[in-house]
Regions:
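Short alpha-helical segments that sit at the start of domains
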Residues: 1-4
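Intrinsically disordered, acidic Ser/Thr/Pro-rich low-complexity regulatory segments
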Residues: 72-224
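N-terminal helix-turn-helix
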Residues: 7-11, 16-70
Length: 224
């Protein structure tokens, strides 16, 4: 097949394509030959995969991990911080944190997990996860709910490895399975023991939004 003609405005096949678009919302260029070449190159590099034979290409765990490391942005909202602070000041510790968790689940459309201490956990928004097609398959849903049944043990296992700053554990890097990602941070509420706040969603979650939600919430709690 002939390549693009000079002056056509279409880059030649093989021109590197920004990997962030493979990780987030890849948009093919206007020339089909260029698009096919770039998609093929991204697939060879492990940034695009086919979940099964008849499926189209989708970003891989490697692509999402690349996006998180290179292009993650913190989107601050003073209004959200004020709402969270007001909720924390109106109720006692655990009740307030649970209310904040429900708010985050509503805003993010994901599940939110709180570890008050090693053997005391709470989660909300589980129904949000099962709206995603990834978790409508029986095996995926079973594995996820099995992990949540052992939530206290899971949080105890990762508690000491959670940083003070918000961090993102993509795919196989988190204990909830390769089809999920976890945005997690350790917080300190007044003179209480440190706790853990986490947002659990699919691999293709909105990383900027969810990271910003967890980070802002952690920062507000730490100021109490």
């Amino acid at each position: 097949m002939a390549g693009p003609t000079p002056g056509s405005g279409c880059p030649p096949p093989g021109t590197p394509h920004p990997l962030v678009q493979a990780a987030a919302s890849w948009a093919p260029p206007s020339c089909p030959a260029t698009a096919r070449a770039e998609m093929s190159e991204l697939e060879k590099s492990g940034y695009l995969i086919k979940p099964h034979t008849s499926a189209g290409r989708v970003p891989s765990e490697k692509a999402y991990d690349f996006f998180v490391k290179e292009f993650l942005e913190y989107e601050k909202s003073v209004k959200l911080q004020n709402v969270i602070q007001e909720m924390l000041q109106k109720s006692i510790y655990e009740q307030a944190i649970k209310q904040v968790a429900k708010l985050l689940a509503q805003i993010s459309g994901e599940a939110v997990i709180v570890g008050f201490k090693f053997n005391h956990a709470y989660y909300t928004g589980l129904s949000n996860l099962f709206r995603h097609p990834e978790f409508q398959e029986y095996s995926q849903a079973f594995n996820l709910t099995a992990m949540l049944d052992r939530l206290d043990d899971t949080l105890s296992m990762i508690f000491d490895n959670v940083n003070e700053e918000a961090q993102i554990l993509v795919g196989t890097n988190n204990p909830f399975g390769p089809q999920t990602s976890l945005v997690i941070a350790k917080y300190k509420y007044a003179d209480r023991e440190p706790g853990v706040l986490a947002l659990l969603g699919p691999l293709r979650m909105d990383y900027n939004k969810n990271y910003s939600l967890v980070r802002q919430t952690k920062e507000v709690i730490d100021r109490i």
